Design a protein with these regions (language model features):
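Secondary-structure end/capping motifs
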Residues: 1-101
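Conserved C-terminal helix/tail region of periplasmic/extracytoplasmic solute-binding proteins
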Residues: 74-152
């Protein structure tokens, strides 16, 4: 968590890019990654936005970028069902509850002296750019709403 907080700070972006750009990590020039870390977006055709609020998130305001939301895990599992990687009868909630240890994250945050961090399990209903809605309490409805799925 401390590393995530460090990575989130703008004054550390250059050093972070130098570290992760090394051969043993990404093996890329710093210039290839520093802009994205800082929120610079190259839209092409000379249109570049610098310092946007679209910088990569590692921590967020109160840890929400790293918090293990069970609702997001439910979406990932649902997508795996969608594409045939998991069986259609997979018990999503049971699998999430067996594998997601948000309690350990919360305990770690407390040990680190962090306050105001997330404590619930869900970000709520998510609406995507295509208008589709994922309700973690009803993943089957999301699956039924999708026209594009695994082709048998």
């Amino acid at each position: 968590m401390e590393a995530q907080i460090w990575c989130e700070k703008m004054e550390n972006k250059q050093e972070m890019a130098e570290i992760v750009g090394r051969r043993q990590w990404f093996n890329v020039p710093v210039t290839d990654i520093i802009g994205r870390l800082r929120g610079d977006i190259n839209y092409g055709h000379g249109r570049v936005a610098r310092g946007t609020n679209l910088a990569m998130k590692f921590w967020g305001e109160k840890g929400e970028a790293s918090y293990p939301w069970k609702s997001l895990d439910a979406w990932f599992i649902t997508e795996n069902i969608r594409w045939g990687k998991f069986e259609a009868n997979t018990d999503i909630k049971a699998l999430v509850n067996r594998t997601n240890r948000s309690d350990l994250w919360i305990e770690g945050a407390k040990l680190a002296g962090l306050t105001g961090t997330p404590t619930g399990d869900s970000r709520g209903v998510e609406k995507f750019f295509d208008g589709k809605v994922f309700d973690p309490a009803n993943p089957e409805a999301y699956l039924k709403s999708l026209a594009v799925k695994r082709i048998a």
